[in-house]
């Protein structure tokens, strides 16, 4: 398993299927500005100019919304994951 550094977060995108009111499956979600993802690992946070550690706002296991074009896709064993900065995460889904 990869261990992210600083304010980086490792996520795995969740495939979502969008349906219209009539129940038709809409082709692709390319029109969306965000994607849904599951947080797999979180870095320790970032340090301020005074050296204080600011902990991340997300935790392992959270479901989050991430900007569509954010991150770097890497391979972790047989699994493709994406490394993003915490600032690329728009919201935590509750």
From Swiss-Prot:
The lineage of its organism: Bacteria, Bacillati, Bacillota, Bacilli, Lactobacillales. This is Co-chaperonin GroES. Keywords: Chaperone, Cytoplasm. It is found in: Cytoplasm. Its main location: cytoplasm. One of its GO terms (cellular component) is cytoplasm. One of its GO terms (biological process) is chaperone cofactor-dependent protein refolding. InterPro entries: Chaperonin_GroES, Chaperonin_GroES_sf, Chaprnonin_Cpn10_CS, GroES-like_sf. Together with the chaperonin GroEL, plays an essential role in assisting protein folding. The GroEL-GroES system forms a nano-cage that allows encapsulation of the non-native substrate proteins and provides a physical environment optimized to promote and accelerate protein folding. GroES binds to the apical surface of the GroEL ring, thereby capping the opening of the GroEL channel. GO terms for molecular function: ATP binding; metal ion binding; protein folding chaperone; protein-folding chaperone binding; unfolded protein binding. Heptamer of 7 subunits arranged in a ring. Interacts with the chaperonin GroEL. Belongs to the GroES chaperonin family.
């Amino acid at each position: 398993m990869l261990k992210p550094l600083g304010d980086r977060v490792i996520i795995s995108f969740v495939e979502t299927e969008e349906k219209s009111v009539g129940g038709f499956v809409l082709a692709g979600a390319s029109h969306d500005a965000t994607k849904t993802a599951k947080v797999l690992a979180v870095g320790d946070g970032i340090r301020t100019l005074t050296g204080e550690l600011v902990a991340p706002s997300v935790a392992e296991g959270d479901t989050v919304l991430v900007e569509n074009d954010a991150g770097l896709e890497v391979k972790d064993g047989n699994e493709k994951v994406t490394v993003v900065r915490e600032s690329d995460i728009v919201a935590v889904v509750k």
